[in-house]
């Protein structure tokens, strides 16, 4: 991985014209140890797609990567995970990677702790500039600046989003979002859900497909929302919540109708 794999750095204060959407998911095996439930991380899944402000997109490419070992210390860092996903994506797509990246999961509070950066909950949140919004983690205050590459010389900006907050009120589950996309979440038995390690050992291909599908739904739903949001507001971004779309539309209406947003009355 080198600078030549990425788009040129964007001039300061210039508009973003393309994003890399990196949907991700983690699979765990829960076990009871000394009356405490511990979660062993089994795998990370990712799905990458580039979206541009002209409405064009790349293909959606996906994959799976395992931690280095069974212990917490063996988990990947956020940097390592992003590098693995981007490297594999670029091998398949042969395009320059945008430096503005949306990292998207469904219920980030479950998936973000899978990175070694988050071993210490408080320090991890501070390091990744995360805010707790409706009991999940997103980046509100500022982007997460990450330096990729062997020499840490490739600057990218990460924005963390949670599709749970971007889902319709009566369609909050990942399965619901998959149905909206026409991309069904794969079915799994209760026994396998409670013993993901057993499923992983017994049927690796299905285990991989099950996890990767979840990350693909996150990516494709995010792309769909960015396009919809741009069509409605002419702003090229993925909002924090579905509610913020309505707020922006109201402000847009006020602007177009010369109304004062402070009191809803005509401007004089």
Task: Show where each model-derived region lies.
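Common nucleic-acid-contacting/processivity interface regions adjacent to the catalytic cores
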Residues: 32, 197-198, 202-268
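N-terminal accessory regions of nucleic-acid-interacting proteins
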Residues: 1-26
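Conserved DEDDh/DEDDy metal-dependent 3′-5′ exonuclease domain
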Residues: 58-198, 209-213, 217, 224
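Structured beta-strand/turn binding interfaces of compact recognition modules in eukaryotic regulators
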Residues: 27, 49-51, 106
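Short acidic, Gly/Ser-rich segments with clustered Asp/Glu that frequently serve as metal-coordination loops
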Residues: 26-36
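Short conserved beta-strand segments at catalytic cores or DNA/RNA-binding microdomains
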Residues: 42-55
């Amino acid at each position: 991985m080198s600078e030549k794999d990425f788009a040129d750095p964007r001039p300061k204060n210039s508009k973003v014209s393309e994003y890399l959407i990196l949907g991700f998911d983690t699979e765990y095996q829960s076990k009871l140890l000394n009356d405490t439930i511990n979660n062993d991380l089994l795998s990370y899944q990712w799905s990458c797609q580039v979206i541009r402000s002209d409405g064009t997109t790349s293909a959606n490419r996906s994959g799976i990567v395992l931690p280095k070992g069974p212990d917490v210390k063996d988990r990947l860092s956020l940097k390592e995970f992003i590098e693995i996903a981007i490297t594999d994506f670029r091998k398949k797509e042969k395009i320059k990677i945008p430096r503005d990246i949306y990292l998207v999961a469904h219920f980030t509070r479950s998936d973000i702790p899978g990175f070694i950066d988050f071993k210490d909950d408080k320090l991890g949140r501070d390091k990744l500039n995360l805010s707790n919004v409706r009991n999940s983690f997103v980046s509100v205050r500022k982007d997460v600046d990450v330096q990729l590459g062997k020499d840490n010389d490739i600057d990218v900006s990460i924005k963390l989003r949670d599709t749970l907050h971007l889902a319709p009120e009566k369609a909050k589950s990942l399965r619901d979002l998959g149905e909206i996309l026409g991309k069904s979440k794969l079915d799994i038995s209760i026994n396998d859900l409670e013993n993901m390690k057993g499923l992983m050992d017994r049927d690796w291909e299905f285990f991989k497909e099950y996890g990767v599908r979840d990350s693909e739904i996150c990516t494709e739903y995010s792309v769909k929302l960015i396009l919809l949001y741009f069509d409605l507001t002419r702003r090229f971004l993925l909002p924090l919540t579905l509610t913020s779309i309505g707020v922006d539309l109201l402000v847009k209406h006020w602007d177009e109708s010369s109304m004062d947003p402070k009191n809803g009355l005509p401007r004089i």
